[in-house]
Regions:
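Beta-propeller-forming repeat regions
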Residues: 1-233
Length: 233
């Protein structure tokens, strides 16, 4: 509302096993593990200074064939550390060749621009129930008892797609969330789907604002099937 650009960052959400904790760190390790001249990435969970592969064996079998052939059963893999699976990559010389990218958060975030910089604002916990793939901000004005009122609507779109078993069994998430910016309290307020009328099912990837006969509409793109069109009231 002040003309400064704010930042909204979608993320995986909290409805997943892929979360760092006090007991374990999670990193993406990138190196030429297979000695093919092509770097590959593997998600690593480190517990008590011991690195373990985070993903299940069937999820990484094509990317890391030597890792798969080094174990004889699923139970052996389940208890094996990377030290057991790739002994050559655990010495100091090989470790120096690995790029390690730590996972810090899977939460979606928002930063509001102020005169002195960006200020992170907490998003309602409901918005963290699933992945957010796109955002849309709409400023709508209406006259109420002679006063011109403007509300800033923030919409997020997403849901689970291309899910891997290692991430856990996700609970059902609302593919769309509708927030309103409360300027007085400088916070986001969640609008229930029953109140907003934005009730969706499925996996959605993007959202756009279009004008039809001078009226604002929302065009919502889905993973499969037909797109959805809503008219603002």
């Amino acid at each position: 509302q002040d003309g400064r650009a704010d930042v909204f960052a979608g993320n995986l959400g909290l409805n997943t096993r892929l979360q760092p904790s006090k007991e374990a760190t999670i990193e993406l390790w990138v190196a030429d593990f297979e000695q093919r001249g092509i770097p590959s990435g593997i998600i690593v969970e480190t517990i008590n200074n011991t690195p373990y592969p985070f993903e299940q064996i069937q999820e990484i079998s094509r990317e890391f064939p030597s890792l798969v052939t080094s174990v004889e059963s699923y139970s052996e893999y389940a208890n094996a550390s990377l030290n057991d699976l790739w002994p050559s990559w655990t010495n100091n010389q090989e470790q120096s060749q690995i790029q390690k990218k730590p996972l810090q958060t899977v939460m979606s975030k928002a930063w509001v621009s102020t005169e002195t910089g960006y200020s992170e604002k907490e998003l309602p916990v409901e918005i963290q129930s699933g992945p957010i793939r796109d955002w849309h901000i709409e400023r709508l004005s209406k006259v109420d008892q002679g006063d011109q009122l403007e509300k800033v609507h923030i919409l997020s779109i997403g849901n689970f797609a291309f899910w891997r078993p290692s991430l856990g069994a996700p609970q059902r998430a609302n593919p769309m969330n509708h927030l309103i910016w409360n300027q007085q309290h400088e916070s986001f307020e969640l609008v229930a789907p029953s109140e907003s009328g934005l009730i969706l099912q499925g996996v959605f990837f993007n959202i756009h604002s279009i004008s039809i006969k001078g009226s604002p509409h929302l065009l919502i793109g889905t993973h499969e099937g037909q797109s959805t069109l809503y008219k603002w009231n």
